[in-house]
Amino acid sequence: MRARHNHDDERDLWDTYATSVTREIGNPVMNWTQYAGHGPGVELLESPSTVLEIGCGTGRTLAYLAERGVRATGVDMSPVMVEAVRERWGDQVSFHCAEVLAFLRDHGEQYDAVYSIFGAVWFTDPAKLLPLVVKALRPGGSLVFSHPPAIPGAYGPQGMYKGGFAGRAQFTYRYSYTPGKWESLLLRSGFSKAEVRILDAPESGHIGTLIGRAVAG
């Protein structure tokens, strides 16, 4: 059974999250993992001229790329988040407030790279998202994404309540798979190449980071 997303409720959840993280937005940064200074960098995107970040959050990565001459576009479903990042980075980056599937269906623009850092790839049904990403990429363009690896034995859509487990029920879904399953999903969706791996944390026994890269055309 597929997860039953309620985008209105999820928008409220992400607005609550945005309120907590936009009080003080940090400096531009390029970091694929949850550990500062750990892991690969901008080279995963292979020198794009144009990028789209899906689930762009605070926009810090887009600002980093824009400072290096990349035409940067971001989409996020939270109006609170988008208002804050437009105020912070709007002179450098184009931000759109939209649900990612609707945005990709409605916008015909193509990009050299699409990426997600703990963003929409983690929170959106890949059967619906990945074919749309393929269409949004120029031939030879790449999708790069990162998020925590699946908990062993817990695969597919995983429900997640907003913190506290009390009050009005607000929840969303994360999509968790093994690297091999991600590669299969990517190839079945129309990518010509796919490589997904788990990068170990800098400290033994800590949570690693799943990093995927796929090429269109």
Name what the model sees in each region:
Residues 113-127:
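A short SAM/SAH-binding and catalytic strip from SAM-dependent methyltransferases
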Residues 52-54, 58-103:
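Class I SAM-dependent methyltransferase SAM/SAH-binding core
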Residues 189, 198-217:
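Core SAM-dependent methyltransferase catalytic element
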